[in-house]
Amino acid sequence: MEIDTDYLGSILMDIEDRVEYADIRAGTSRTSSILMKDGKLQEVKSGRASGFRIRVLRNGSWGFAFTDEPSRLGEMALKAIKMTGSLRGDVQVGSGAPSVDKTMVRSSRPPSDVPAAEKRELVSDAHHAASVDGVVSTTVSYVDMESSSAFLNSEGSLIEMAETRVALFLNAVASDGSGIQFGHKSCGGTGGFEILEREDIEELGRRTGEKAVRLLKASPPPSGRFDIVTDPELTGVFIHEALGHAAEADLILQGDSILEGKLGEKIASEGVTIIDDPTIDGFGSYSYDAEGVRAAETVLVENGVLTSLLNSRETAFKLGLEPSGNARSAIGDQPIVRMSNTYLKPGDLSFDELIEDIRNGVYLRGSRGGQVDTGKGIFQFNAAESFRIQDGEIAEPVKDVSLSGNVLETLKNVDGVGSDFRLGIGFCGKSGQSVPVGDGGPHVRIRNAMVGGT
């Protein structure tokens, strides 16, 4: 479906004298997915969708309406105006400079040009490779997404974007009759099928299965305070969940963030610099956010000091800050403050230097989920795989290890930042919405961390 931007512009012109601000997002998307479990194809899906949403600001309140029929957009505009009611709200967005632009993610192999049989073969190869001896169940999930969208607002912006993403997720379950363990790997990014072709899928699958089997023989988890090292995946999960969400300005305005009132304060050690950046190559990349704000790097923490927050136009105005380009949503949802690619900036230490003076510690790799209370600033994460560190050397494997504590205390106990870097892929949920994100960083050393079992 071609998006008629002239028609969308005429809808805005019809209502601009009746509202303080208005914008329209229109988009089309195509997705395909494959799910294989234990050697059998469970799902092979493909679909298309399109939609139009209009948002108006009137009397300090938002009105919002959505339709999948372009001919009803004028009707939806009136519905959105009516939703604002007669009572005065406190929402303002300030004035923004209009943007006129066309952007697209370039791909040498758009997923829609790749035969379904080739995608199934990729999934089958990954599944077969992960099914090593000792693995009793394997699941492989493939997904690709292609979308085109247009954004127009009453300030004169007209932005057209095309985005493409692909991802592959692998899970293996191993059992020895007395217990079970799990292995998980993923790959993908913003771009076409060529991203997965560059990966050694069989090696990725084999490592997934071998991890699960290896954990069956691991020792029980230690418990207490230890010096630890986290790998790039767990570093990224911690930064995303514990710091990134707390830096979302809507949570701060709701009184649900440990970072409330801390701008300009030192909240971490000198070596900690945390960045959210939708312009780098990652699963959470984009050129403009859902409010037409150009994407840009946001340095949240610089050398331990909280320097910025993630903002929408509304939250930025309320806090006296600049919009950061972090209002995100699907076409049919109200934009809310979200992360993009969030990571801890690498330092200059090698892995050997990070562990060399740890006499009795733990090396934590990967993530098996966890939980965070952004208001209280406490967290608990489960590592996918762990090892003892003895006298500066990696020693025996241990399983079911958890990391918990206070977010700010833990950030202040970071005293070594590795020179390596890896950015993972995933989907982040908030307020019933899901967006693609990247998170990562280097290996990191944390002193006196609380470690226990899951």
Swiss-Prot record:
Top-level taxon in the UniProt lineage: Archaea
SUPFAM superfamilies in UniProt: Putative modulator of DNA gyrase, PmbA/TldD
Enzyme Commission (EC) number: 3.4.-.-
InterPro entries the UniProt entry points to: Metalloprtase-TldD/E_C, Metalloprtase-TldD/E_cen_dom, Metalloprtase-TldD/E_N, Peptidase_U62_metallo, TldD, TldD/PmbA_N, TldD/PmbA_sf
KW Protease (keyword) present: yes
GO terms (BP aspect): proteolysis
The entry's keywords: Hydrolase, Metalloprotease, Protease
Region spans: Disordered: 92-115
UniProt xrefs under Pfam families: PmbA_TldD_1st, PmbA_TldD_2nd, PmbA_TldD_3rd
Biological role stated in the UniProt entry: Probable metalloprotease.
Family per record: Belongs to the peptidase U62 family.
Protein name stated in the entry: Metalloprotease MTH_856
Organism: Methanothermobacter thermautotrophicus (strain ATCC 29096 / DSM 1053 / JCM 10044 / NBRC 100330 / Delta H) (Methanobacterium thermoautotrophicum)
Organism phylogeny: Archaea, Methanobacteriati, Methanobacteriota, Methanomada group, Methanobacteria
